[in-house]
Amino acid sequence: MLALHQTQRDVPCSEVHDALGLQGARSIYFGRPTGRSILSDPIRPRPMPTVTVIIYSDIRFLLEFPSVFLCAYVLPVQRTVIMANEKRGGYRQINQALNICAWEGYLNEQHARLPTLEDVEQISPRVLRVLGQNEGKVRRADGYYTCSSRLIEGPQFTLQGTNTYIVGTGRHRLLIDTGQGIPEWASLISSTLAGSSIELSHVLLTHWHGDHTGGVPDLLRMYPDLSDSIYKHTPGKGQKPISDGQTFRVEGATVRAVHTPGHSHDHMCFILEEENAMFTGDNVLGHGSSAVEVLSTWMSSLRMMQSLRCAVGYPAHGAVIRDLPSKLDLELTQKARREDRVVETLKQMKTETQRNGARGKGSVTVQQLVTAMHGHDLDEQVRTMALEPFVDEVLRKLAQDDRVAFEVRGGQKKWFAIEYT
């Protein structure tokens, strides 16, 4: 994998326009911090037609994890985007291709700033939200936004921070997710529980990523009686398993677990039966779209989530999703549109090949397909680190759906659209 340049440089936005959905974008920046990082500088709002993407890469990280490209965090400064490659905290994310999908959803919302969420808020009669204090941005006194020191240390894609939820109405309640292990979160949980005379009976973890499980040690330090009450789909040491359909009950709340892999293999959502609401974890966020491990698996999980017909979503990041069915429809529609474009491009390339007198399936490599979709003048890093992995993942999903296939010719894997007559 090529290391990113040490200094900023302009890249024509046409190279990533279609993949990222950057309507009217003008410039993309690549770089890695050296000396005085511009992350410490104010990020000043730019005219609305401008989109700036700043990608940071630590060469030591790339050498250690050459196939890993961490997901983006998008700062809500009109249409400015910050990305940071970072090994610690949050999660070591995952699939360099599907982060492109995540960018698109966020960028579509950059005309508005993210809403402010209270540190502790009663968002329904049965649900109390406590922010994990691992926000991905900090608003400076001068009104400009810059990256939180916590962002540089770990969490990406955390938006206003990880949402942790205290669920129930009685003395004994359950907790969903534990944040990233930020001391301020532990203090908030302690004061909130003590102030309302609440005791925790169960701790349910949506998945293994560190911005959801990092607070477990603090909980056990403060409440050692919880040592037998930590639940996760694929349990770690000292944890108990959660099975699909398993039900947890406390006064005022019946919570049913639903296995929804995609964002991660062990991802669980939880349905709050009394409210017809779903704790969506990282599969569906309050703002934008989530990065995922396996596109086909994630889309299947979203369709399954649709079938459950929950009205409201309580996401692991971002504001309450007041119309969960519409949000799920939007997520699936956006991904389907990208699949259709790949298939249509393959068909067009076959037609052009046959028009030139060639025979066969008109199969092409991923590199050729990317060129056909995005032009010849692509920056090499944009091609190899973003567009090609993205298109390759979409092709794998389409192959599972029997819409494309590949053949090996000249030692190269070449893809073609399956046309049914």
Curated annotation (Swiss-Prot):
Catalytically driven reaction(s): atrochrysone carboxyl-[ACP] + H2O = atrochrysone carboxylate + holo-[ACP] + H(+)
Binding-site residues, Zn(2+) 1: H207, H209
One Pfam family here: Lactamase_B
Inducing factors: Expression is positively regulated by the transcription factors brlA and laeA.
Residues that bind Zn(2+) 2: D211, H212
Obligatory cofactor(s): Zn(2+)
Distribution of this protein across tissues and organs: Specifically expressed in conidia.
Name of the protein in its database record: Atrochrysone carboxyl ACP thioesterase
Organism: Aspergillus fumigatus (strain ATCC MYA-4609 / CBS 101355 / FGSC A1100 / Af293)
